[in-house]
Amino acid sequence: MDDYLASLDIVVDIISANDANISRIAQMTQKTNQFNLRTQRYTEEDLKLKLKNGSHIYCANVKDKFGDNGITIACIVEEQNNTLFLDSYLLSCRILGREIEKITLLSIIKHLQSQTGKEVKAEYIPSKKNAMTKDFLEKVGFTIDSEDPEGIKKYSFNSDLEIEIKDYYTINFK
């Protein structure tokens, strides 16, 4: 698998939300169902308010040797007192299966923790369509703090965990 992934020349450009991409991020929150941890829906105005209130909002453009997939990842992280809360993390299904979902989230967490020094919390809220993300956070270094009878899981990120991002991925923050 490593040889195959290395042969793809995968480049992930992680971009802070701006006027040029915020409508695409809003669109993704409204349409992405399968790989969506909390299935929160936001308008462009909602996202602008979140930015004004100090949230960190990113999107990612993924390209490989076959072409440019465009903006296919959205991530919203809120600052809540002494923690960062992963409000939303979602991906277009067309880029799944190349570990891009893992390396992008870990890169964003590492970036934000280096800037803020804050602990990261997250949540999984089950929906009719997002079962594929049920255990995703556990696979990328989060520990379950609690789970309620409806299947809502609350997590903390294990920041002591060594984050391995294979060197055949190129990650750029823009």
Regions found by a protein language model. Name each.
Residues 150-174:
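C-terminal "cap" of GNAT-fold acetyltransferases
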Residues 65, 71-148:
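Acyl-donor binding region in acyl/amide transferases
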Residues 1-18:
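Conserved N-terminal entry element of GNAT/NAT acetyltransferase domains
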Residues 28-29, 75, 138, 160-162:
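Short, surface-exposed amphipathic charged segments that create phosphate/polyanion-binding patches used
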Residues 13, 17-94:
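A conserved beta-strand-loop-helix scaffold within acyl/acetyltransferase catalytic domains
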Residues 4-8, 28-31, 85, 114-118:
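Short acidic (Asp/Glu) and glycine-rich catalytic loops that position anionic groups and cofactors
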Residues 46-47, 127, 154-156:
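A glycine-rich phosphate-binding loop feature that marks nucleotide/adenosyl-phosphate handling sites
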